[in-house]
Regions:
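P-loop/Walker A NTP-binding module and the surrounding RecA-like catalytic core of P-loop NTPases
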Residues: 80, 110-347
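Non-catalytic terminal/linker segments enriched in charged/polar, low-complexity residues
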Residues: 1-140, 162, 167-168, 338-347
Length: 347
């Protein structure tokens, strides 16, 4: 290879690296904008009220802290988490001798970040590129009917497919009418394969066939749907135990992840659902859907603080690309992101 060929190769490599970097940056900016848009209702209910209450030049006193406490509670952050945030703010104010209320805005933001930091968030690379995992990687979705399990599976399948993974869906919700049809539509949209049987079939049999097919077809990731029947915990527990047993006949570590899907619009009811489901299944992560349709997005903070279960994915819209890997820093920045014309001072 001549000197000019070497120079040309170096230039081409540099250009490709620059283009890849720009594409990645553009994608991240787009995702942040979608996240910010999706949190509009929560931001209007929580952050804008907080900003208005703090006001310019207002002094810090117990009356102000009580007003802020009420805002946090009504934003579905939860009593225990609100108490933690307020106590942290109160202690910092006392220790640092803060007087101007403008300081509180940043203190609350930092305490929320501290709550999220207690549970490390995996990187996009690790999640979607399935780094350091045994394949097929098996993810099981649980949750009551209507929270968006089917949609979540379809969007997750799409996300994994974008990273060149071979995806297989198992339609093990054989009790709900039209569940198979809906999941089949999403499988087609994501352009992935699906294993299903007729309505009323044994869910464990569907799971068994799905794992067998996934191993035979060398699938990278398997997504399992399940029925949502929390009102009958005894039957649900038996069903999940049976599903777990048949999975382990194919792969000892399966399921590798158990994701509980929750509807953000239900607010504190979502926290209660998480508590109940944790009694019947080893939940490894939360998927919080419909954040764009509610002012109750603060529930994500309470779930993290009180249940110590990591939020792994969030739904910020109806489009197939609107299921995002949860990034606590991006979430907090988007939540507190104010219009350019609004200035919050931190003296």
């Amino acid at each position: 290879m001549g000197i000019f060929d070497k120079i040309k190769d170096k230039v081409s490599s540099a250009v490709k690296s620059t283009v890849d970097s720009v594409v990645k940056t553009t994608s991240e900016v787009f995702q942040f904008e979608r996240l910010r848009d999706g949190l509009t209702k929560t931001r209007n209910s929580f952050v804008n009220k907080l900003r208005a209450t703090i006001g310019l030049g207002r002094k810090i006193d117990e009356k102000l802290l009580e007003e802020i406490e009420e805002i946090l509670i009504t934003s579905d952050i939860g009593f225990a988490t609100t108490e933690r945030i307020i106590n942290s703010v109160r202690n910092t104010v006392k220790r640092e001798n803060y007087e101007n209320a403008d300081r509180i805005y940043e203190l609350i933001k930092q305490e929320i970040l501290a709550i999220f930091a207690e549970i490390p968030a995996p990187s996009q690379e690790d999640v979607y590129k399935l780094n350091n995992v045994e394949k097929p990687f098996v993810m099981m979705m649980i949750g009551v009917n209507g929270v968006g399990k089917t949609t979540t599976i379809g969007k997750l399948a799409h996300n994994f497919k974008k990273f060149d993974n071979k995806v297989l869906i198992g339609a093990a919700d054989t009790f709900r009418a039209a569940a198979n049809e809906q999941l089949d539509v999403w499988a087609k949209r994501a352009d992935v394969e699906i294993i299903q049987q007729k309505q009323g079939a044994d869910p464990a049999a569907v799971v068994y066939d799905t794992l067998a097919a996934g191993i035979a077809r060398k699938s990278d990731v398997i997504l399992i749907d399940t029925a949502g029947r929390l009102h009958n915990k005894a039957n649900l527990m038996k069903e999940l135990e049976k599903i777990n047993r048949v999975m382990k006949k194919h792969k000892e570590s399966a399921p590798d992840e158990v994701f509980l899907v929750l509807d953000a619009t239900t607010g504190q009811n979502a926290v209660q659902q998480a508590r109940e489901f944790s009694k019947v299944a080893p939940i490894t992560g939360i998927v919080l859907t419909k954040l764009d349709g509610t002012a109750k997005g603060g529930v994500i903070i309470g779930i993290t603080a009180e249940l110590k279960i990591p939020v792994r994915f969030i739904g910020v819209g109806e489009k197939i690309d609107d299921l995002q890997l949860f990034d606590p820093i991006a979430f907090t920045e988007a939540l507190f992101d104010l219009p350019d014309e609004v200035e919050v001072t931190n003296e």
